[in-house]
From Swiss-Prot:
InterPro entries: LMF (IPR009613). The lineage of its organism: Eukaryota, Metazoa, Chordata, Craniata, Vertebrata. Glycans are attached at N489. The chain crosses the membrane at residues 10-30, 74-94, 102-122, 126-146, 165-185, 227-247, 259-279, 312-332, 364-384, 399-419, 637-657. This is Lipase maturation factor 2. Involved in the maturation of specific proteins in the endoplasmic reticulum. May be required for maturation and transport of active lipoprotein lipase (LPL) through the secretory pathway. It comes from Bos taurus. Residues 680-696 have a biased composition (Polar residues).
């Protein structure tokens, strides 16, 4: 069986990179979102209620409770955590010495602390996904065994612990839950766009932050959009069970299908770090053999030499072909695929009913849980077999302790995850073991396992609703307040901001889907714009002179609701077209009774002003200095700058101190090729230990 040492290293590096992006992206927005003059000041969320310290920490698990001990308020504590998280993640990305469980525990704890006070701006599925992935990374991070001076068994590197494959299996299970649920909820929501296979005819222009490529994708033929929806259902519903296939080529095919989907989403939409994190999860489908990039000669040497092995290889190939054929027949049958040779199109339509889907879901939900349990049982048996091979009493004892702890943790996390996974099918949720429910309810607030289901319903079927803020000095001449990232100016192309998530722009998209009373924070945004608070202005326009009211705050602010569509191909110089719908938020000014009433209704009036004197604290002054240095940079530039710095350092490390990646188990014990030894023997040399050892081992590019 191929090992997974290199994929685990890639996973840990990928998680570190995503944490770096998440912390740095949030850091740039903290003053405007959570500062004393922000939209939703964070200090309102952490108010002692007379409970004990540990009880308070358990009920609201955040390190920000300790911020006053450092002389910081809650917002400054957020900045400190974000900066430390960015630096720690950057270090883990650059050096493997920081691929330690404690490092990933700190990253997870810091992000959990941030999410506890993030309120509506951190209520996204990818924030929950990052927390769950970060906790798994803590378990995946290697814990070596004591050194062994005796030779390790064939195929077993001496420092590898038997339990290391168990937590990494949970990553595969998480990827399965994410993709399978995301596909199923599109149909269980009864959204007519998904059932009619027309979702992508709307998606590209109605998603929150499209990219320029989305404009071109939107104008593709309708039949291709519908075929793409069919492919999406195939990749998200039919392919994920192959994650647990015993045939590795089936797992690799599943891997490449998931990568294809995520890359296409990245090209057409700005979904911050979500798709990057999903790509990181797909490393659980890889193995060392696939990443070793061995030559064709070595592949020929692995061809079966005996007839039992040849028969097994033939049966495996037949199984692969049967699976591919079954998938193809299923897609053709359930989506009515037909080739229209006259029109040169592929026609598709949904050939099943909602009742049939519900019955199918009742049939497969519990079996998929048992599939996961069977796969986990195999991993446990494999880990036990590896433990049997450990040599040395001390090493065997340490390995037994590690296997017991991590095996128990793996089984417990699997049981916990079954509860949110079963949300998509109520009857299966009710039949789940009560112990799993109790275990989940105990740790639910830690977000160790979450339910997922992205793009449940397609919005904006009649055009994307968009809120446009306007300001005025006299109440007659109105000037639009243009945001940096969300659609507004008809002639401005959609930006590329990934992996940054502009949290305010995202919430403006959600606000447009309903009345402003469904988004209480919007009233606070209007108040801050009337007050001319610079931290909030920087969320709208980081370059303050680009903000139309940078010299003097507007006297009046209102909001209009428009419907936006992508422009037609023949409309030169425009990316969008729009139509006015209605007034979204009435014209208000400071002291307006209507505004004051809304602030009281939503509890947004600030009754406890921040304490003065915090600026004299040395740590507070240091945070202020860092903020002053970084504030001129736009968030995407900062994040891409960090990534560029990592790339440059990696290149310098490769040039100045080349070190090969950890070799796979097969490579470590692979004898030198015969032709190399023969060639070496022809070179007369008094030092025979140089002849065969001078060959530089094949190196893989650093990830």
């Amino acid at each position: 069986m191929a090992g997974s040492r290199v994929p685990r290293q890639l996973f840990l590096q990928g998680v570190a990179a995503v944490f770096m992006f998440a912390f740095a992206s949030l850091y740039t927005q903290i003053p405007g979102l959570y500062g004393p003059e922000g939209i939703l000041p964070a200090r309102r969320t952490l108010r002692p209620q007379g409970k004990g310290r540990w009880q308070q920490l358990w009920e609201t698990p955040t390190l920000l409770w300790e911020a006053p001990l450092l002389g910081l308020d809650t917002a400054q504590g957020l900045e400190l955590l974000s900066l430390l998280g960015t630096v720690l993640a950057l270090g883990a990305l650059l050096t493997r010495q920081l691929h330690h469980p404690l490092v990933y525990l700190l990253l997870w704890a810091a992000y959990l602390s941030v999410c506890q006070v993030g309120q509506v701006f951190l209520y996204f599925q990818w924030d929950s996904l990052l927390l769950e992935t970060g906790f798994l990374a803590m378990l995946v991070a290697p814990l070596g065994l004591p050194p062994n001076h005796k030779q390790a068994p064939q195929g077993r590197p001496g420092g590898v612990s038997p339990h290391e494959g168990l937590p990494f299996w949970l990553v595969r299970w998480l990827l399965f839950r994410l993709m399978f649920a995301s596909g199923v909820v599109k149909l269980t929501s009864r959204c007519p766009a998904w059932w009619g296979l027309t979702a992508l005819t709307y998606h590209y222009e109605t998603q929150c932050l499209p990219t320029p490529a989305a404009w071109f994708a939107h104008h593709l033929p309708v039949w291709l959009h519908k075929l793409s929806v069919v492919a999406t259902f195939l990749i998200e519903i039919a392919v994920p069970p192959l994650f647990f296939a015993p045939v590795r080529r089936l797992r690799l095919a599943a891997f490449y299908s998931q990568v294809l989907l995520q890359v296409l989403i990245i090209l057409t939409g700005n979904y911050n770090f979500f798709n990057l994190l999903t790509l990181v999860l797909t490393t659980a489908l890889l193995d060392d053999t696939h990443l070793a990039a061995k030559s064709s000669t070595s592949r020929r040497k692995r061809m079966p030499s005996s007839w039992p092995k040849a028969l097994l290889a033939m049966l495996t190939l037949l199984l692969e072909l049967a699976v591919y054929g079954l998938l193809a027949c299923g897609v053709v049958h359930y989506f009515g695929l037909e080739v229209d040779w006259e029109q040169h199109v592929v026609r598709s339509r949904t050939m099943f009913t909602f009742h049939q889907l519900s019955q199918w879901l009742k049939t497969v939900t519990l079996p998929t849980m048992w599939l996961g349990a069977a796969s986990l049982a195999w991993e446990l048996l494999t880990a036990l077999w590896r433990w049997v091979q450990v040599r040395g009493s001390l090493r065997k004892l340490c390995a037994a302790v590690q296997l017991s702890v991590f095996g128990t943790a793996t089984v417990a996390l699997f049981l916990i995850s079954l509860v949110p996974y079963s949300y998509m099918e109520p009857s299966s949720h009710g039949r789940l073991w009560t112990g799993a429910h109790r275990l989940f309810s105990t740790v639910e607030h830690l977000q160790l396992a979450n339910s997922y289901g992205l793009f449940r319903r397609m919005t904006g079927l009649g055009g994307r609703p968009e809120v446009v803020l306007e300001g005025s000095y006299d109440g007659h001449q109105w000037t639009e307040i243009e945001f940096m990232y969300k659609p507004g100016n008809l002639s401005r192309p959609p930006p590329i901001v990934v992996p940054h998530q502009p949290r305010l722009d995202w919430q403006m998209w959600f606000a447009a889907l309903g009345p402003h009373t469904h988004s209480p924070w919007f009233t606070s945004l209007v108040l801050r714009l009337l007050q001319g608070k610079e931290p909030v202005i920087r969320l709208v326009q980081n370059h303050v002179p680009s903000y139309p009211f940078h010299q003097q705050p507007p006297t009046y602010v209102r909001a209009q609701l428009y419907k936006y569509w992508f422009s037609h191909p023949w409309e030169q110089g425009q990316w969008w077209r729009r139509q006015w719908v209605e007034e979204f938020f009435p014209s208000v000014s400071l002291g307006d009774p209507a505004l004051d009433m809304l602030l009281r209704q939503f509890g947004l009036q600030d009754k406890s002003p921040p304490r003065a004197g915090g600026s004299s604290n040395t740590l507070s002054q240091a945070l202020h200095w860092v903020r002053k240095q970084l504030s001129p940079l736009e968030a995407p530039a900062l994040l891409w700058g960090l990534l560029g710095a990592v790339g440059a350092i990696k290149v310098m490390q490769a040039l100045l101190g080349p070190q090969s990646l950890p070799r796979t188990k097969e490579e470590k014990h692979k004898p030198a090729p015969q032709e190399d030894s023969v060639a070496a023997s022809k070179q007369a040399s008094p030092a025979p230990n140089i002849s065969s050892g001078s060959q530089t081992p094949r190196r893989k590019k650093s990830p």
